[in-house]
Amino acid sequence: MPQSFSVDLSKINLALDSVRSIQVARRFGQEILIVRKETGTEYLDLDGSALEKLSREEAKDIVSNVTSLTPLAVEEISDPEPGSEYRGRNLPLFKVVTQDGENEKIHVYVDAISGQVVAIRTDQWRLWDLMWGLHIMDWEERDDFNHWLLKVFSVLALFSSITGLLLFFKIDLN
């Protein structure tokens, strides 16, 4: 459950150009600002200064604090890969390989600047993602469901339904 806290916005020194939203969050007990602009996302402290990237150890500490998982290894991700588990997330990220009580390996993705856990990926999620890719016929990115083969089968299904209704009600087209 999110914790509540007070922030005096009059003390924050911000240049507000093309801002879409401002979110106040906590990073290691310190309030930070997540400023989403048209050009991207900025992470600032309450003075308006840019935040430094977290260390690998800090990413492990975050995962230990917000989950019941045991961190094993940390990998920094700064280049996007098509079809990855973290697709659609802001980079850089830390991929923290963890283990649960049943020795299942679980990947926890932590934003390298805000410290927020942005994704948790288990074997069950990977199976779901595979089935989703097969369902929408997008095996690489798993984001585009406008595959031409899917459209052809949709038109055939619509045609079959209409002809089935015509036959059911015995409509004579002559």
Model-derived features with residue positions:
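Conserved histidines in hydrophobic membrane contexts and catalytic metal-binding motifs
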Residues: 1-174
